[in-house]
Amino acid sequence: MSAIDNLPPLREVIATHQLSARKSLGQNFLLDLNLTAKIARQAGDLTGCDVLEIGPGPGGLTRGLLSEGARKILAIEKDQRCLPALEDIAAAYPGRLEVINGDALEIDPLAHLTPPIRVAANLPYNVGTELLVRWLTPKEWPPFWQSLTLMFQREVAERIVAQPGSKAYGRLAILAQWRAEARIALSLPPGAFTPPPKVSSAVVHLTALPEPRYPADAAILSRVVAAAFNQRRKMLRASLKGVSPQIEDHLNAAGIPPTERAEQVSVEDFCALARSLEKG
């Protein structure tokens, strides 16, 4: 039995249920319970908090989160093969784990969880970025979550915390740093996973700010930033031409030289541009 709980080691679990990670679902399983406990601790004190977990797989992180004191976990798993392993965990922690077989993009966490809510997940690589952008761009702020503790490929993690002027700086950095404090909390080598991915991974911890750093409409900012970085080597007057016929006027109003390139523009200045566009 595991030291974390009275459940079998994860290698035994995946053997019993004949589980193997599927590339089509972006899966890589974490089977070291000491490591999943360490990741769970990055989410902070979970006592009195509900937790949303996406893609729990055989439940390694789930077990870590429960042992760290999560009040209740909503685990959304698309892969039906993993459900029996998760139901075993639910039986060991009565009333504290709800498992839904479905797509995280289609499920409202607030229908199942009670604030305060934290999100912790070894995100499937094929939906991780889309989920993060969605969590960072709701119309209303603060969001349903207090914090996000998320596993990404190292390259994606570096894009979230990147600063202007760096190659990694782009849409993710701007949206994350506009409304949250973001830091890389933990690095993991490929060998931590089964099967080992070709690249290293990292855990990013984001804490929601009470209000955005600068005023801006989320939808407008998101559209502007996406257009600007879609052609990041072009001058903004060219890359943003499709956003507004008067884009040079809006850039000047925001104090941004129209000849500037996207990677040189700060979060504050992108927000000023979004406000100018909103005024029309």
Swiss-Prot record:
Residues reported in the UniProt entry to bind S-adenosyl-L-methionine: 28, 30, 55, 77, 103, 122
Entry-linked SUPFAM superfamilies: S-adenosyl-L-methionine-dependent methyltransferases
Pfam families assigned to the protein according to its UniProt record, in alphabetical order: RrnaAD
Coiled-coil intervals, chain numbering: none
Catalytic activities: adenosine(1518)/adenosine(1519) in 16S rRNA + 4 S-adenosyl-L-methionine = N(6)-dimethyladenosine(1518)/N(6)-dimethyladenosine(1519) in 16S rRNA + 4 S-adenosyl-L-homocysteine + 4 H(+)
A cellular-component GO term for this protein: cytosol
Gene Ontology terms for molecular function: 16S rRNA (adenine(1518)-N(6)/adenine(1519)-N(6))-dimethyltransferase activity; RNA binding
Keywords: Cytoplasm, Methyltransferase, RNA-binding, rRNA processing, S-adenosyl-L-methionine, Transferase
Range of residues in the leader sequence: none
Predominant localisation class: cytoplasm
Subcellular location(s) per record: Cytoplasm
EC number(s) recorded for this UniProt protein: 2.1.1.182
Cross-referenced CDD domains: AdoMet_MTases
UniProt xrefs under PANTHER family: DIMETHYLADENOSINE TRANSFERASE (PTHR11727), DIMETHYLADENOSINE TRANSFERASE-RELATED (PTHR11727:SF7)
Purpose of the protein: Specifically dimethylates two adjacent adenosines (A1518 and A1519) in the loop of a conserved hairpin near the 3'-end of 16S rRNA in the 30S particle. May play a critical role in biogenesis of 30S subunits.
Similarity comment text for this entry: Belongs to the class I-like SAM-binding methyltransferase superfamily. rRNA adenine N(6)-methyltransferase family. RsmA subfamily.
Protein name per the record: Ribosomal RNA small subunit methyltransferase A
Species for this entry: Ruegeria sp. (strain TM1040) (Silicibacter sp.)
